[in-house]
Structures are given as structure tokens and as C-alpha cells.
């Protein structure tokens, strides 16, 4: 099956758009059933479903849910496209957990009533690199790097007690005499001794050629979709006072003449900080912005990153910007020049090495660091942040190698590197 859209009925009602998507798949030569997926409420199903496509319910766990969808079905199947054994987690919040005893009754109802279903998620996995998403309710809520999701298989693909409970329930609905297959042997895991970081590369020493614009502009206007971006301007007229970054997306560290002044955090609803008077008067303002994750559900899907509106200082609009896109991709990392030096200001890459004589999955502990991104042998493991709840990043065995391995940490806030060690477990 191929899904035409995902919960579109929650925030859109463009029938032509849905028909165009279905037409695309009809003409593609892919001869499989199509379906839509929406919440089990009348307006969502009416706006999100389309004739000729099966209807998926997110979730569908009772007669009322299915009756509402079948009213619109016009002869196509109805099924539960997302049954939630777990849930996602945002930075700064407790781990989202769904108790097994709360989830199993819904699964049992679907089985007893002969309904088709899909578990979301059966195996959660990881938001590697910059792929983590975000939500927005009353505030911006970026997702943590882990997409473990409290799923039946954990982030490393290992069965959990929740998996065992689901397996036991499914076994009761097997044909007489049928036997579930044995579980495979667990994948190897390993620990990594403490890694020291002896080399540093300041991000401000590795800026590309600037792009000059009157106003800052979102990173998409510079051909960039993720990572970081630096905005620099000369201060004329106003040189101190209240700095306001209108519509910041998503996290900024602010510097004046190279001195760190503080951070502005979209998750807290922050838009400003105070710039003190300097002696002599301050001349250069730097705003380094991190794109933390795009909103992927609801009416705010257009989530441009960087500085998406103007910047003011005591109500004076600051003009004349130099913009430095910092995608922090493979090409960018390949140009870093590491050396043994003490950083003068926050915003630095730190490099360490370690040796391995065996391979396996591991979890790298970043609890001593502040906020940033980690690469292992060039593979971007994702973001970490001291506010938690996630403190360890999953590193799968294929990212590691026998012999020498390299870790690069980019931290927005620390001047002195902490340590990193690998553990066999998530917590």
C-alpha cells in the first residue's frame, strides 16, 4: 500500500491537491492500493479522504471510529493506520511513555473485531543528522534526536517487555497449531572508554564567503535547508540596548565584537536580549542561529529557518548584513582545521579519537556538554542538549570501524570540552 497524504484533514481541505496526488500515483505504474490517513473525527475524515483510496484511521480503536469512516468509504477498506504503543518526546520534557496495560486493550479490540492495523511505531529508530521534527501547540516543541518512541523494539532494535506482551497477545489469535518463530539472537553491543578531546576548530575561523543583503532572511533564501547560519552586521547609530530578533527559528547565540552576550531560545518564546554599552563603542554584531527541527504537523508547516524577519536595536531596524550559511555537511566538516588551542569564545568543534577491537551498537553519553551536534567517523548522530531528557545518542555498529575512530563535537556554549563515553544502554 502507498499512503497518499498524512493527516491532511487536520489542517487542509484542498480536494484538487489530494486528487492531483492520487493521479500522480495512478500514472506512476505502481500498481498497489492507495490510502489516506486521518484522525477519526468527521471533519478530518471528510477533508482528508478521497474517492478510490482506502481510509486509514489515526488511530481507530472502537466501533464509533470505524463507523464514521465507513460512512465515507464508498466501498473501500477502512483500517487503523496508526495504533500508538508509544509516543514522541520533545526537548525539555519528560520521556513520553505509554504503559503496556493501557495500550493492549486497543490492540485486543482490533484483533477481536477482525480489523487491520499498523503499529506506529513498531520500531522507533533515530532522527539522525538534522532530521528531527517539531510540533507547535502554545509554543515551539522540537523533537529529541531519539525516535525510540517507547516502541516494542527499542532504538537499537532490541525487543522490550512491551514487545513480549504484544507477542503473547498475537499468539492467542494464531490458527490452531500455529507457532510463532523464535526470536533472533540480540545484536552485539559495546562500551567505549572515556574519550578525551585535545583538538579544537572554532567555527568563526571557518566561515565561507559572505552573502550581502539589506535584511537577514531565512536560510532557505540562501539555498540551505538545515544546520546553522551566521548573520553579521556593523552597528551604526544604536550600539546598545534591547536587541529584538523578530521571528527567530530556532536558537541563537549572540556576540558583540567577539564577546558572547547570551542566547535566545524559541522554545521559551524568547525574542530579545540586552546589549550593554561598550568602551569603546561596540562595532560588530554576530547572531549564530541553529535550525532545530521543522514543524511537521498542523497549520504551521511553513517553518522557515534562521532569522525570518527583521532585527532591531532599541527599535532601530538593523540593515546591511553579511550572511554565512553553515550547513555543517560532509564538505564543510572536511575543511575544518583542528589544532591544540584554547577557544576564545563559544561555538567550537572538538575532536577526539578512540580505538576499537570489536564492533557493536553503543550509546554515546553527552551529559557533560551543553548544546550541539555529534559526528562519528563523519556520520551525524544528531543533536544533544543539556536540558534533556536525552543524554545519550545512539551510534549503530555500521558507523564504527576496527582500529581508529573519530568523534567530532560541535558545541554552541562550552569553552572547555567534556568527555564522551559509550554505553550499552540508552539510560
How should each PLM-predicted stretch be described?
Residues 1-119:
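Substrate-binding/catalytic cleft of secreted carbohydrate-active enzymes
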Residues 1-13, 172, 176, 343, ...:
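Mature extracytoplasmic enzyme cores
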Residues 3, 14-18, 22, 30-31, ...:
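Carbohydrate-binding surfaces of carbohydrate-active enzymes
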Residues 169, 272-284, 349-350, 355-357, ...:
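Short, surface-exposed tryptophan/glycine-enriched loops
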Residues 225-234, 344-357, 393:
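Short beta-strands within extracellular/lumenal beta-sheet-rich domains
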Residues 264-270, 382-393:
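Aromatic-rich membrane-interfacial microdomains
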